[in-house]
Amino acid sequence: MNNLYRDLAPVTEAAWAEIELEAARTFKRHIAGRRVVDVSDPGGPVTAAVSTGRLIDVKAPTNGVIAHLRASKPLVRLRVPFTLSRNEIDDVERGSKDSDWEPVKEAAKKLAFVEDRTIFEGYSAASIEGIRSASSNPALTLPEDPREIPDVISQALSELRLAGVDGPYSVLLSADVYTKVSETSDHGYPIREHLNRLVDGDIIWAPAIDGAFVLTTRGGDFDLQLGTDVAIGYASHDTDTVRLYLQETLTFLCYTAEASVALSH
């Protein structure tokens, strides 16, 4: 048994398998950041912080001594509770193929959104600076007319190249912007195809973000550091329900300020 305490949950192996499958499917469907940043191997439950490699000057304890603190970034634990019906869980053992796992999917979607917003917008309470505020490139404005979006993306790519940032490059679009470029054509040619010709990486649906981001995916510029990856744990139960949660521990580091361009409405 570990500190997820899953062995204490009144959940059969077959039900666990379905719950985990729904959680994994939903999380992967909504997550975008992990497709464009480096993801370090999980350090394990004992990992409380990651080193930045920097030193911080501190007052020496006595004359003739130079003192420094090793700078580090603490990991934040993100937990999303959800509740399942015991009848829905037990129905799996009786052969049910349509148990209601909507609470699982809602929790997985929420955790994916929180992780992506942490990566792109930052999380000041957890000492995490996001890609938007860390970027040293001037932010660009997304036009209202989707037919003008390729020109702005091209401008963002030029900013990256002029800053000496090599590709491949990817573009992340919020849900509304992605819909616009997918549904709009210019002289019979889909805007999405215009973007595909400009970008040598991926055009990514990123529902958690606002606006868009253009960044390099060459590696070494952005790092999602995990203590424990996404997992399901047990909280409690009664005669009718089982209370579980999705959880991960992480921090995020931006190493190269010039490796991204943010686009806002």
UniProtKB/Swiss-Prot annotation:
PTM note: The initiator methionine is partially removed. When isolated from culture filtrate isoelectric focusing gives 3 bands, none of which are glycosylated.
Topology of the protein relative to the lipid bilayer: Peripheral membrane protein
Compartments in which it is found: Encapsulin nanocompartment; Secreted; Cell membrane
GO CC terms, sorted: encapsulin nanocompartment; extracellular region; plasma membrane
A Pfam family hit: Linocin_M18
Keyword tags: Cell membrane, Encapsulin nanocompartment, Membrane, Secreted, Virulence
InterPro entries documented for this protein: ENCAP, Encapsulin_nc
Domain of life: Bacteria
Consequence of gene loss (knockout): A single enc deletion survives less well after 3 days in 2.5 mM H2O2, pH 4.5 (mimics growth in the phagolysosome). A double dyp-enc deletion mutant cannot produce encapsulin nanocompartments, cells are highly sensitive to H2O2 at pH 4.5, mutants exhibit significant dysregulation of redox homeostasis, survive less well in C57BL/6 mouse-derived bone marrow cells and are more sensitive to pyrazinamide treatment in infected BALB/C mice.
Family: Belongs to the encapsulin family. Family 1 subfamily.
Protein task: Shell component of a type 1 encapsulin nanocompartment in situ; its cargo protects against oxidative stress at low pH. In situ and in E.coli assembles into proteinaceous shells about 22 nm in diameter with 2.5 nm thick walls. Cargo proteins are targeted to the interior via their C-terminal extensions; empty intact shells can be isolated in E.coli in the absence of cargo protein. There are at least 4 possible cargo proteins, DyP (encoded in the same locus), FolB, BfrB and Rv1762c; DyP and Rv1762c have been identified in vivo.
Subunit structure: Multimeric. The encapsulin nanocompartment is formed by 60 subunits. Monomers form pentamers which assemble to form shells. There are 12 pores where the pentamers meet as well as 3-fold axis channels and dimer channels; none are larger than 3-4 Angstroms in diameter. The N-terminus of the protein is inside the shell, the C-terminus is outside.
Misc. remarks from the entry: Stimulates a strong IFN-gamma response in memory immune C57BL/6J mouse spleen T cells, recognized by monoclonal antibody HYB 71-2.
Name used for this protein in its record: Type 1 encapsulin shell protein
